[in-house]
Amino acid sequence: ALIPTAACTTDADGVVVIRGNRILAAGDKASVKIPAGARESKCSGGFVTAGFQNSHVHFVGAAWDDAGKKPAADLARELVAMLTRYGYASVFDIASDRDNTLALRARIERGELAGPRILTVGLPLFPPNGLPIYLDHLPREFLNRLPQPATVAAAVAVVGDNLAAGADGTKLFIITPQARGLQRMSAEIARAAVDESHRRGKLVFAHPTDIDGVAASVAAGVDILAHTTHGVETPWPDALLKRTISQGVSVIPTLQLMGYELKKENVPPAVTQRLVAASVEHVRSFAAAGGQILFGTDVGYMSDFDPTEEYRLLSKAGLSAMQILASLTTTPATRWKKFKTRPASTS
């Protein structure tokens, strides 16, 4: 088997030593000690990589309801369909019913069902009266639980409660589309939420919506933009691009999402192509200038689980195969400093 790495090296005569469901060693045949009596399986023509991380997923919808009690076989089937069949060994859920997602994670960690390592931001923060129109399809009971802090103190309390409950980060919706216009999170509230998260050693995601949202996110000190600026045809200003990169802000492009959303709205193909191309150019400029890309697809919100189109669009944005592999493996591992705890997957 070939064992490629994001550093562009490949073990052409690679071997993988597996005991039970754990990988004990992987590398060149000459350097890996094979235990006596091991059964050998030929895997010529295949590839083995580090387990992938999808840094933008959501455990929302009927498939995940009551995850603490739902039959394990049902949940395992959904995890395979949405995630593990595509090589995701780790996922970051960046908005869901926190307690339900934590219950799902606990069952995986107890060994009740096979699934990826789950990180979650739990309940995201929105501007006051700022739930976006594209969440209207979700149950009212869930929407009523989504925090919309109106003061700095309230935002700090929400972040503290969320992280204390077991969340692994914070997500801010900086600007949200409404039926009429946009709703914006105040700079003071955004900064306070970021500062409290950082004080507790956690990273912050932001949903920017547009270029003003990117600027506000960067000014607040967020760590990761959950999307590029879909639907925006103008380039990011050079000064904003440079500041975003100099502050170490990562971007999760979610390029496949743009076409998915426009198809739902029956937007003419020519318009869709133009808007998707604009998103691709935003990512091209960011990556070419040295910006850090994290792979993510928004599955869970998006019902098209197959990431093939995301790979194609990232390639169109100028990322090499090894850069895309890095965005799935070594880059998130570096970002979360989890080199020694990340599982591996094969394909």
Could you tell me what each predicted segment is?
Residues 199, 273-347:
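His/Asp/Glu-enriched, well-ordered alpha-helical/loop segment
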Residues 66-114, 146-168:
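Alpha-helical scaffold segments that flank or form the walls of functional sites
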Residues 59-74, 129-149, 176-184, 229-235, ...:
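Acidic/histidine-rich helix-loop elements
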Residues 2-15, 28-31, 235, 320-326, ...:
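Acidic, glycine-enriched loop/beta-strand segments at the rims
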Residues 103, 154-228, 232-251, 273-292:
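Histidine/acidic residue-rich metal-binding segments in metalloenzymes
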Residues 7-49:
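Histidine-rich, glycine-flanked metal-binding segment
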Residues 51-57, 91-92, 118-123, 170-172, ...:
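Hydrophobic faces of well-ordered beta-strands that scaffold small-molecule active sites
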